[in-house]
């Protein structure tokens, strides 16, 4: 806590900013409060990634869209209110081709690991009685994904 006043201006100057200029960096409290905030942030990111994965699967498997068509959908989404780093990199991944000119996305191993922050967010939500179903399902999907040999 004593160091915050000394570094606040530096950190807030280099931090991302909201549209109104408010820095996306602030002191959130003592005793691991910042770590808790980061854990929740990562849990939300798990949910976002799960939504992106499910949207991709629906477009590819149900709608029969090509990687180029899916790329365009993500590009359109990234121009509107869904604009985000995760949508942007999903858009970019859809455009990558391998040395044969085929979509690289189809050659990426379909397993996902985890470091635990999504799981910790879900466990904390359960302890607090907060329904956090998207993050919980995202964690379960990652657990299933990691067991490729058992699920395929």
Language-model segments: residues:
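Rossmann-like NAD(P)H-binding beta-loop-alpha module
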Residues: 1-18, 39, 50, 58-63
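Small-residue helix-packing motif on alpha-helices
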Residues: 4-7, 70, 135
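Conserved Rossmann-fold dehydrogenase catalytic segment
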Residues: 15-46, 63-82, 86-87, 91, ...
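A general alpha-helix detector
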Residues: 39, 54, 120-121
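Catalytic-loop motifs flanking and including active-site residues across diverse enzymes
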Residues: 47-51, 117
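A conserved active-site cap/scaffold subdomain adjacent to cofactor or substrate pockets
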Residues: 103-152
């Amino acid at each position: 806590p004593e160091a915050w006043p000394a570094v606040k201006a530096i950190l807030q100057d280099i931090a991302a900013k909201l549209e109104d200029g408010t820095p996306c960096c602030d002191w959130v409290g003592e005793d691991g409060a910042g770590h808790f905030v980061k854990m929740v942030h990562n849990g939300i990111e798990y949910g976002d990634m799960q939504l992106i994965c499910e949207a991709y699967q629906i477009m590819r498997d149900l709608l029969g869209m090509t990687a180029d068509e899916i790329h365009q959908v993500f590009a359109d989404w990234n121009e509107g209110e869904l604009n985000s780093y995760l949508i942007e990199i999903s858009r970019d991944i859809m455009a990558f081709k391998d040395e044969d000119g085929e979509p690289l996305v189809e050659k990426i191993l379909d397993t996902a690991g985890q470091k635990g922050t999504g799981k910790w967010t879900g466990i904390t939500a359960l302890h607090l009685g907060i329904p956090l179903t998207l993050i919980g399902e995202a964690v379960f999907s990652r657990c299933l994904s990691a067991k490729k040999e058992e699920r395929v």
